[in-house]
Amino acid sequence: IVSGSPPASGGVALIDALNILEGYDLNAVDKVTRTHLIVEAMRRVHRDRAVYLGDPDFVQVPVARLIDPDYAAGQRASIRMDRATPSDMLPGVDAPSPGPSTTHFSVIDAKGNMVAATITLNFFFGSGLMIPDTGILLNNQMDDFSAKPGVPNGFQLIGGDANAIAAKKRPLSSSTPTFVMAPKGTMILGTPGGSYIIGMVLQGTINFMDG
């Protein structure tokens, strides 16, 4: 699996979630349990997104640790099969809102060249400002920074000091353009959806691998 690296948060979150879920046989459990396990994995990766991820030019992002199977095993050990984890044990994972203004396209040609591209203005019409005589709208990606640690942004995502605003710094993103290469074939995927992106790509990847 090949996916995006910070400041896009999706690749790290996707691999972390897949590592957590690798310890379960999702095809052997009922639909309710399957959904419960996926949700609990996503809650943990969004907690880590809030705490650790930011622009690697400005903060030390522990990518190797976050995608380590041993780290995922520790996350998995905290999941109860019979109940949801109390929210106060997972700060920074409030329910997200979907995003309206993102586009994703996946392309592969006859020679096997692949492109997975996620493009966004962030909110409807971005900042609402247009470059004169061009029709090009300016985005409002500044909202993807943590204006104040612990305070949600426009998509209700909680951030921390790692994603604080700084000059020349890039904001964190949920974009998750991904290539999945397996013996059964290759899948290119990504999606719009704001803070839902990581979870949707995770489910698409699981369905492809299990289907």
Residue ranges of model-derived segments:
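Structured, charged N-terminal subsegments at the starts of enzyme catalytic cores
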Residues: 1-38
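Short, well-ordered beta-strand elements
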Residues: 1-6, 13-17, 105, 114-118, ...
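Short Gly/Pro-enriched turn/cap motifs at secondary-structure boundaries
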Residues: 5-8, 94-98, 163-172
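Extended C-terminal regions of large enzymes
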Residues: 6-9, 165-167, 180-196, 208
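Catalytic-loop motifs flanking and including active-site residues across diverse enzymes
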Residues: 9-16, 103, 171, 175, ...
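Alpha-helical support elements that line or immediately flank enzyme active sites
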Residues: 19-22, 191-211
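Internal maturation/activation junctions in enzymes
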Residues: 23-121, 127, 133-134, 141, ...
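Active-site rim segments in enzyme catalytic domains, especially the processed small/beta chain
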Residues: 114-183, 198, 203
